[in-house]
Regions:
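Bacterial Sec-dependent N-terminal signal peptides
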Residues: 1-23
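Subset of outer-membrane beta-barrel
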Residues: 20-423
């Protein structure tokens, strides 16, 4: 029962925060300055499947499927199916162009009650791009692309506990070797890993309603920094952490309802605040981010620069020790604003038909992604078809508006009945 109480508390806190992005005691977005965190290879963090894509991207603690390799490999230890393969397709940024897309192929296989293996291929096509010189003369047309290969392994520690690890190789070729601003460019190559942990209780109760409670933590895309030329600065890839809660209520043999909540944040340093003062690029607040991977992950929890104070003349105010004054609580407010909140619902009828809905919230100072998702599924024997639709809540002109996702899933191994005894 204590786990259900934690789920309710986390859910309530998340929706309270989502519902008050512009209210409260000065903790609103307008108190902070625009300070978006950017990374290289952002395609590694795009939701590939239409199930989580129909639930506000709250996929970390959802019941296992082949697309769990992206969200949370450790949950595959609790899969009811022996194996599954899925194919997903997402036309991307169709408000801007019509030839960018993400394709995703994933599969898993349960070796026995303890060991599960899987893999996935992610391919991101940026469409056709025309390269020109400084005078606007056409040099050539090219079709830049990026891809990622993932190997996955889940190990069941106990009846209700599991861990997972992914090994990844990613390749990003955005320029086709063309010189950019007179500098030779190159493809970016990444080696990365995902780590995940799941607590899974299929004997949970919410009041008198029986169901399944899942709590999961994942650390994703932990890998090397990359650059597209020998002279450019090496940038972080989208390393991130997700904390997920989900409860599936089994009302009867026909109806199941899942509530899912994710808290997500990048594990990448926040850009520091610099300003040219007397011709010198001066650090006003925050911390330099030209550091290593592990140091960057740790620093990401305490490096928000906040809002630097100004006097009535618009000049930055200095402290007695020569540092610059920062508005009270603004650093903490900015750190908290880096947490994205995702929530979703899923209703299944007779394990044949499903409807989904969800919301996603990101601070306007950190990217301003706010959207509503709708989704549906049809399942017949070993085949399932998933669909989702994204409606932007960030205002008119969002490039994410009207995003569609499609997924086909095939159960190719029957049902596994193996159980693990409680330790």
């Amino acid at each position: 029962m204590k786990y259900i109480s934690f789920f309710i508390f986390t859910t309530s806190l998340s929706f309270f925060t989502f519902a008050q992005p512009n209210g409260g005691s000065g903790a609103n977005d307008t108190d902070l300055q625009l300070n978006t965190i950017t990374t290289s290879l952002p395609f590694m963090a795009i939701t590939p499947d239409s199930r989580a894509g129909g639930m506000g991207d709250a996929g970390t603690a959802l019941s296992p499927s082949s697309t769990s390799i992206y969200w949370n490999t450790s949950i595959l230890s609790f899969a009811k199916q022996k194996s599954e393969i899925s194919m997903s397709y997402t036309p991307w940024l169709r408000q801007l162009t019509n030839d960018i897309s993400l394709s995703y192929l994933s599969a898993y296989y349960k070796i026995n009650k303890t060991h599960t293996v899987g893999g996935s291929i992610r391919y991101f096509s940026l469409g056709e791009i025309t390269f020109t010189d400084a005078s606007g003369n056409v040099l050539r047309d090219d079709k830049p692309s990026e891809f990622e290969l993932t190997g996955a392994y889940a190990f069941r520690l106990a009846k209700k506990l599991s861990i997972g690890i992914n090994g990844k190789f990613a390749y990003s070729n955005l320029t086709g070797g063309m010189p950019i601003a007179g500098v030779n460019s190159k493809a970016a190559v990444v080696g990365a890993t995902d780590l995940s942990f799941t607590y899974y209780n299929d004997e949970a109760k919410l009041g008198k309603t029986k169901g399944v409670y899942t709590f999961a933590i994942t650390f994703n895309n932990i890998g090397n920094k990359v650059a597209y030329s020998e002279l450019s600065k090496r940038d972080f890839i989208p390393m991130n952490m997700k904390i997920g809660n989900a409860f599936t209520a089994d009302f009867n043999s026909y109806n199941k309802l899942t509530f899912s909540i994710d808290l997500q944040r990048l594990l990448v340093p926040t850009p520091a605040k610099y300003e040219f003062i007397d011709g010198v690029n001066t650090l006003l607040s925050g911390k330099p981010n030209d550091i290593g991977i592990i140091a960057g992950m740790i620093q990401s929890f305490s490096d928000a620069p906040g809002t630097v104070s100004k006097d009535e003349n618009g000049e930055y105010i200095k402290n007695a020790d020569g540092t610059y004054k920062v508005e009270k609580w603004s650093r903490l407010k900015e750190e908290l604003s880096e947490i994205n909140i995702a929530g979703g619902l899923e209703w299944w009828y007779n394990d044949v038909f499903a409807l989904r809905s969800g919301v996603f919230y990101e601070s306007k100072n950190k990217g301003n992604r706010k959207f509503l998702n709708l989704g549906a599924s049809l399942k017949y024997n070993t085949l399932a078809i998933d669909f989702s639709y994204l409606a932007s809540l960030s205002g008119r002109g969002s490039p994410l508006s009207n995003t569609l996702r499609f997924t086909l899933r095939f159960n190719i191994g029957g049902v596994t009945t193996a159980k693990v005894e409680s330790n």
